[in-house]
């Protein structure tokens, strides 16, 4: 594949001679706007999702399972939709699904939640593929225009976005903590006011999304107005779905993509219900998830700053996985619910450690896909959401039927396999990069030596 020829190119700093610095756009403005827009939208959706399994019981659990099944299947066609619409238009359209889902929570029933969940699956697929495509594109343009190292810019841009995005858990759950009250016999009050506040926040985020600039050349990218082009695009859809899975690099990182979804679903479906709620109540879910979001944000920004290439990504991901494993082992072997200060502190400490792991995974996976799949960004991020949403859906559907201990064993096994697979992938790609760089060096050295000779081929023949 053509993309394989460049898999390690961003990981090697170019010399000053090879870079042409030209005056260009400053794309940091668009990163700020995109990040704030996602913060406003997801502080509402994230907090609502955290409450689904505790407030809406089985309806909430099944609705989230339906949502992520829809998300998984729609992600298979999301790259085509984003290419046809353009990443900015896809981002704007994607916000509508989140608005509708929160609105459905004003009157939660099977007739409101199931359709809203199905549509949100589609909307989520295009907004996340659009986000990954847009952020990667402007990072590359910014690096090219300002003569910066591409891998570092991708890391910084992803670090800022994911740090701001992680703050949605902090702010959204602080709002939940302030407005939601525990009632008698496990009931809660204040949910209607909470959802109205969330809808207002989402509306602001949607409006703000209109102010990001389109990617250069994107206007002519999708053949929306051409019936022939549209038919050709639809005909190529099976190839677009299958082709990424024929790339050995994608197959090698599938366990990492799936684990990132598993660990998120564990927090949303199991941790909030089985650990936080019994210890500090339904209203305490907001406080625990606020701590989770705060550490998630800090680690997203920090990890993004240290990202420079495949080796750094592997090292950072391993650190995040070790942090999360400590919580899984604690819950499996040593945790017992207690009263008093420790009974409140333990879930908060666990939430903080899980947030560290999530912040690391988010930034590093996005940077990894951007570095390895330069020629098919939409397809790469679509695969990310396919495997993430599939893993999340499995957890939500199994949650009512599987014990916490069994889930923890699954998480530990998957974590260990993911870490080993990530190290193997890094080693394989690094060796491949060394062999290619050695070949390039030998070729360049041969050319330079030959050019330094006093006579050329033509002159040597004419001389003799």
From Swiss-Prot:
Keyword ATP-binding: no
Residues passing through the membrane, by range: 31-51, 62-82, 84-104, 110-130, 160-180, 192-212, 251-271, 275-295, 313-333, 341-361, 392-412
Pfam family, one: UNC-93
InterPro entries referenced in this protein's UniProt entry, alphabetically: Ion_channel_UNC-93, MFS_trans_sf, UN933_plant, UNC-93_regulatory
Record's bilayer topology term: Multi-pass membrane protein
One BP annotation, GO: potassium ion homeostasis
Keywords of this entry: Membrane, Transmembrane, Transmembrane helix
Cellular component terms (Gene Ontology): plasma membrane
Subcellular location: Membrane
Top-rank taxon, per record: Eukaryota
Record-stated family: Belongs to the unc-93 family.
Protein's name in the database: UNC93-like protein 3
Organism in which the protein naturally occurs: Arabidopsis thaliana
